[in-house]
Amino acid sequence: MKKSSLLYKIINGIWDMCYIWKTEMRNVFRDEGVLIFCILVPLGYPLLYSWIYNNEVVREVDTAIVDLSHSHSSREFIRDYDASPDAKATYYCNSLDEAKELVRRQAVHGFLYFPADFDTKLNRGEQAHVGVYCDMSLMLTYKAIYQTSQAVASHINSSIQITQAGGFTDRDDEITTEPLAFDEVPIFNTTGGYGNAILPAVLVLILQQTMLLGIGMAAGTSRELNRNRELIPVSEHYGGIFRIVFGKALVYFMVYAVMGMYLTLVVPKLFSFVSMVTWTTILGFLLPYILSCVFFGLMLSCLVRYRENVMLLVVFTSVPLLFMTGVSWPLSNIPGFWQGFSWVFPSTFGIRGFLRISSMGASLSDILPEFRALWIQTGVYFLATCLVFRQQLRSARLKANLAAEVAEEEDEAEEIVDS
């Protein structure tokens, strides 16, 4: 077969791509750092995070009480609060400073504050206030204290309304306290828990972040082992852009295709989270999401000079990226600039699409905007990766030629000296 023929070039390109794939795959499993980020973290971290929030709610949350009123009304509020299943009045303090110290020592997760004029204002028919102070480092305890306080306050408000209305029958009292009756029926997040609300988004974000960390660390290792500190080595197998890009991309796509199915199908089932995922939908959805993450990571790998750099570039972005998806913060309250900035990252559309698939049973046609956006990102980042690798390949060849010329000059100089 002639070397100039098209068939020979195609076969040679496929052979080189397989060689690059084999080399990159071997490096992934030999490099401890890359192995941790690409294999161990996606396997273990979701289990730990899901286990923490598996209970969905917490019970008997320790709470301090600062009662400066010492009245019948404040004691009634505290008694009802302590009788609830979610919270418990553990400490009674004489000042705010004493309660703050308990929160600082993690003895309690919050405290209730009753001012001295609490009962006086109620008896005058004025609006009274109860201060609710919560430690927001754990959302489950914050939710338990805050919602229990609201429920008790609503119950006491109803009692005051009944007293002031002067109704004659129980039906009159019902109409006074609840003129419009309604039943709250959760449709998607049936447990109303934190895990079902946030965990699907976190699982999808883990895919992107661990992939970026693994690709970045592998790129840093390649530069450190390269004599010219270049991302792409000078070799006969690394002679074309497409074979390099496809060879490297195939490695991470194969690894994260398995991890993606594990995170989206296995983990929710293990912890009994709401999951309405179907095989066909999730396979069609993960294909553009994983590809866009792979090409996005390969494009950014040119910025990594040392292995440690990737930690600075990726790790701190996890929480902001989760906020910008509109999952833990209302999308309507996010400025337009940051909404546009979030479109750069595949996780934005990946999280929004997967939440609809997992919690609402959506099909690919129901998430068409996110599905199209992921394919657009795949195409854009693929072209950007090819351009970046082309520049890196040129730079590597240029430095290799310069190094060869310098070596020849040194050899000639040594021969002159010896003669």
Residue spans for each PLM region:
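Extracytoplasmic/periplasmic domains immediately adjacent to an N-terminal transmembrane anchor
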Residues: 1-196, 391, 397-419
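Alpha-helical membrane-protein architecture signal
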Residues: 14, 18-22, 196, 237-238, ...
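Loop-to-transmembrane-helix entry motif
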Residues: 28-35, 206, 247-253, 257, ...
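Hydrophobic core positions of alpha-helical segments in small-molecule transporters
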Residues: 37-38, 200, 246-247, 310-313, ...
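Hydrophobic alpha-helical transmembrane segments of multi-pass membrane transport proteins
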Residues: 44-47, 185-268
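Membrane-spanning alpha-helical segments of multipass transporters and channels
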Residues: 48-49, 91, 101, 254, ...
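Perimembrane helix-loop junctions in membrane proteins
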Residues: 53, 57, 220-228, 306-309, ...
